[in-house]
Regions:
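Glycine-rich phosphate-binding loop of ATP-dependent small-molecule kinases
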Residues: 1-318
Length: 318
């Protein structure tokens, strides 16, 4: 990482319901003097894959209603048909990062004219990059015909329009004095051995990030046990069903719950400890990409109990 006053990128990662969003809110509450001590700039600009996961589920609901089938998730297990969609999500937020770097918050007119096509195309392009998928929406159109596909798109229009609007609202006119915050969670099946098999875990997903991101990122990992994560997830899902703190926004609310079988099958463990044990540099995550090894600077462990405010530790810029 180049010597500089502020971290260009801070990644928040942990198991679900571990306090990433609460910690992000805490960062936003800090004064400039306080954030300077952590080598952070202003942190309101974010990159988060949760809105895309949420949109996948809503698109699937529309597809099942209109077309009689789903695109991303198995209706019975509620898990991905193909777990390589974890890679799809990384490629989506790679694109978001570079759109942010352009510092142009004006939405291109062609996207405004058809926000559904814009989002469906983004999913297809990102998925194809993993090497594991065809162009799914293109194939849906061929399978069901123009009229039925048009009805499906109409069902998805409002959702896609909101995602488009919020994506560009998140793009600043300048990155001067800012730290871009990434938020995402990765894991693997309960009881899995290490290394986790692709596409599970941080080892797989981090290696898909663009080199520029890996070269400029530090990671703040919030450490909780899977059991703590399960319990907090159940609590916030219940609060969500009761209508507490809900929002029409596609952005992350504190009350989105992950299905319990998904918690067990995809977040029953993670590979952060395993990766740290492989690193020749203590406290760094070693990530291999395209024949190079990147060491993500510096793990700041926030070991916390669910419900308590996380305390950030000061780290050294290198």
């Amino acid at each position: 990482m180049q010597a500089q006053k502020h971290l260009p990128i801070l990644m928040f990662s942990s198991l679900p319901a571990s306090g990433k969003s609460e910690s992000r809110r805490y960062l936003k509450s800090l004064t400039k003097e306080q954030t300077d001590k952590f080598h952070l700039g202003e942190t309101s600009t974010q990159v988060d894959d949760y809105p895309y996961v949420d949109a996948m589920r809503k698109i699937d609901a529309a597809a099942e209603k209109v077309l009689g089938e789903t695109v991303f998730f198995d209706p019975k297990s509620t898990m991905f048909f193909n777990s390589y969609d974890w890679g799809t999500l990384v490629y989506m937020i790679n694109d978001d990062y570079f759109d942010i770097k352009r510092c142009d918050p004006k939405i291109p007119e062609r996207f405004c004219q058809d926000p559904v096509e814009w989002l469906f195309n983004r999913y297809d392009v990102a998925a194809v990059k993993t090497g594991q998928f065809p162009s799914r929406f293109f194939n849906l159109k061929l399978k069901h015909g123009e009229a039925k596909y048009k009805e499906f798109k109409k069902e998805c229009h409002d959702l896609c329009a909101i995602i488009l609007k919020e994506k560009y609202e998140n793009i600043p006119k300048s990155l001067e004095g800012k730290t871009i915050v990434f938020e995402f969670a990765r894991g693997g099946p309960e009881g899995a051995s290490f290394p986790l098999k692709p596409p599970f875990g941080y080892e797989y997903s981090l290696a898909l990030f663009d080199k520029e991101i890996l070269e400029n990122a530090a990671i703040l990992y919030i450490w909780v046990t899977p059991e703590m994560s399960y319990n907090k997830n159940l609590q916030r899902a219940k609060e969500g069903q009761e209508g507490k703190s809900q929002t029409v926004s596609t952005q992350l609310s504190l009350n989105h719950g992950v299905p319990h079988n998904v918690m067990k099958g995809e977040y029953g463990t993670d590979d952060i400890d395993y990766l740290l044990g492989l690193s020749p540099k203590k406290g760094y995550l070693p990530i291999k990409k395209d024949g190079e090894e990147f060491h993500i600077n510096r793990i700041s462990e926030s070991r916390k109990r669910i419900g308590q405010r996380s305390r950030l530790k000061k780290w050294k810029m290198e």
